[in-house]
Amino acid sequence: MTLPTDPAQNLASLIRCRSVTPVEGGALTALEAMLRPLGARVDRPVFSEEGEADVENLYARIGKDGPHLMFAGHTDVVPPGDEDAWTHPPFAAEIAGGEMFGRGAVDMKGGIACFVAALARHLEVSGTPKGSVSFLITGDEEGPSVNGSVKLLEWAAARGERWDAALVGEPTNVETLGDMVKIGRRGSLSGRITLFGRQGHVAYPHLADNPSRGLVALLEALMEPAFDQGTADFPPTNLEITTIDVGNPSVNVIPARATAAFNVRFNDTWSVETLQAEIHNRLDRAAAENRLRPGRTEPVSFELEWRDRPSPVFLTRDDKLVATLAASIEAVTGRKPQLSTTGGTSDARFIKDYCPVIEFGLVGQTMHMVDEKVPLSDLETLTRIYQRFLENWFS
């Protein structure tokens, strides 16, 4: 029986599946076909949520005993955009100039392809691992993340699955393979502010109440002063205004309502609850100060709505896990990786509730872009790093 030891061949099989969230597109079927020859027991649970599309997921395990290492990731990808803008079709896995092109090449079908190849090589050399390896793979990472990893973890844990450590194969490297490992993630909190005024003619402002004035003052309060100066492990907390809207196409009408949305990426100075309280306090103070509203004495009238699912900040302090991966990277590439908490959120935010988790994959420079691509040499290098990591972890 031929084992899936070639990462490029594995990746081509996955890229050719049009698995744009939430469509499975054949990607999990292709992955299952790779894992079965390795002796994996495979389940494909489908999860549902009212108002969301059903999503198929995959959980596979090789081995029965501990220690138990989880590899986590996703086969779903973002849409390719204008396919005519691609040099090579986004779902063809064409190779040119020593690089494979395709949506998901680095985010993150490439990471999955390499870990499968690494495990296959490890089993060829060492036989059944002294413990267990599992794959926790979702089709809902690039979407709302409602019917994906969060439910797959609950499902597996309810069946008695327990993990000692997890590795997520997201594209963590900035410029060169081996330059960065993610050992934590900032938290993420989103909200929407709505201000209510009174519509009127711009030539008669005393007869109206322009909510845009109050909105400017409230947004200033969110932007200044800085929330903090950063910590030993995280950069400073950062708030960005993401939308501002008054729903008013006319230039001579004062709007009746104004809204703004924001997102905060926060460090370990804050919890979700303490940050929400700080934002509420800032808005309440700014509303009471009543700046930028001449002739108005009543406070600004506003509503604050928390959006989406907040993600708490986390930091993995498992010295063995981090040291084993860092040593494996250095042994293969000669580089000492930076241990970082930068970047956006990932499904590691769910996994950290079950076991220590770190992230390491390919270079992310072309992820989500037209002509997403990966050098074939990087696929081989990452496979060798993963294989060395498996050898060291189970030694």
Swiss-Prot record:
Uppermost EC category: hydrolase
MF terms (GO), sorted A to Z: acetylornithine deacetylase activity; cobalt ion binding; succinyl-diaminopimelate desuccinylase activity; zinc ion binding
Regions annotated as coiled coil: none
Pathway: Amino-acid biosynthesis; L-lysine biosynthesis via DAP pathway; LL-2,6-diaminopimelate from (S)-tetrahydrodipicolinate (succinylase route): step 3/3
Any GO BP annotation: lysine biosynthetic process via diaminopimelate
Domain of life: Bacteria
Record carries keyword RNA-binding: no
Annotated keywords: Amino-acid biosynthesis, Cobalt, Diaminopimelate biosynthesis, Hydrolase, Lysine biosynthesis, Metal-binding, Zinc
Binding site for Zn(2+) 1: 74, 107, 170
Listed Pfam families: M20_dimer, Peptidase_M20
Keyword check for Hydrolase: yes
SUPFAM superfamilies, A to Z: Bacterial exopeptidase dimerisation domain, Zn-dependent exopeptidases
Active-site residues annotated for this sequence: 76, 141 (proton acceptor)
Cofactor note: Binds 2 Zn(2+) or Co(2+) ions per subunit.
Cofactor(s) for this UniProt protein: Zn(2+); Co(2+)
Protein residues bound to Zn(2+) 2: 107, 142, 368
Functional summary from the UniProt entry: Catalyzes the hydrolysis of N-succinyl-L,L-diaminopimelic acid (SDAP), forming succinate and LL-2,6-diaminopimelate (DAP), an intermediate involved in the bacterial biosynthesis of lysine and meso-diaminopimelic acid, an essential component of bacterial cell walls.
Protein family according to the UniProt entry: Belongs to the peptidase M20A family. DapE subfamily.
Quaternary structure and interacting proteins, as annotated: Homodimer.
Entries under PANTHER family matching the protein: ACETYLORNITHINE DEACETYLASE, N-ACETYL-L-CITRULLINE DEACETYLASE
Protein's name according to its UniProt entry: Succinyl-diaminopimelate desuccinylase
Lineage: Bacteria, Pseudomonadati, Pseudomonadota, Alphaproteobacteria, Hyphomicrobiales
Gene responsible for this protein: dapE
